Amino acid sequence: MENEEGKREMTKKQSSRFKSICVFCGSSNGNKASYQDAAIDLAKELVMRKIDLVYGGGSIGLMGLVSQAVHDGGRHVIGVIPKLLMLQELTGETVGEVKEVADMHQRKAVMAKHSDAFITLPGGYGTLEELLEVITWAQLGIHDKPVGLLNVDGYYDALLLFIDKAVEEGFILPTARHIIVSAPTARELFIKLEEYVPQHK
């Protein structure tokens, strides 16, 4: 009986409402090993839950770590990269399917089209821009896909405080604050994303 319950629980853990998830992250590794560990942990969760990866197409930094680990785990990987970044963000062999696009705007549109949800790891300006755009799209009703923030070692604490301040000052509606789902680990984040229901409509 206990074995049957265990099997059911394992099946439940491995199934997901998402078929593919777009991951935004840095083309650098960051200065802490915890950022790289978080990227690998996220990849393992995607593989365990049988979720395919859509990402920015780079083979360096956290992007490279996530894509390689998901590909090695047997899941489909779609990398979307603008022509102008091909030399900067690609080194050696690429993994999975690479979609070359004209520019950054098309990159985000294609990534969103092929994804059921978004997860953001630590990153810089480009990562923030991608995150804020999909949050804005959700607020405008362009999509109702969950937006997850993997807040590794409090990396995004200041951003979340800023957003809370914007709510407090009347620039963001309280219901729109709930567009962002955050957690410190991939496993905790997935639990929240699986249960996510939009509140901002």
Curated annotation (Swiss-Prot):
Its EC number is 3.2.2.n1. GO terms for molecular function: cytokinin riboside 5'-monophosphate phosphoribohydrolase activity. It is an enzyme of class 3 (hydrolase). InterPro entries: LOG (IPR005269), LOG_fam (IPR031100). GO terms for cellular component: cytosol; nucleus. SUPFAM superfamilies: MCP/YpsA-like. Belongs to the LOG family. PANTHER family: CYTOKININ RIBOSIDE 5'-MONOPHOSPHATE PHOSPHORIBOHYDROLASE LOG6-RELATED (PTHR31223:SF90), LOG FAMILY PROTEIN YJL055W (PTHR31223). Cytokinin-activating enzyme working in the direct activation pathway. Phosphoribohydrolase that converts inactive cytokinin nucleotides to the biologically active free-base forms. This is Probable cytokinin riboside 5'-monophosphate phosphoribohydrolase LOG6. It comes from Arabidopsis thaliana. The lineage of its organism: Eukaryota, Viridiplantae, Streptophyta, Embryophyta, Tracheophyta.
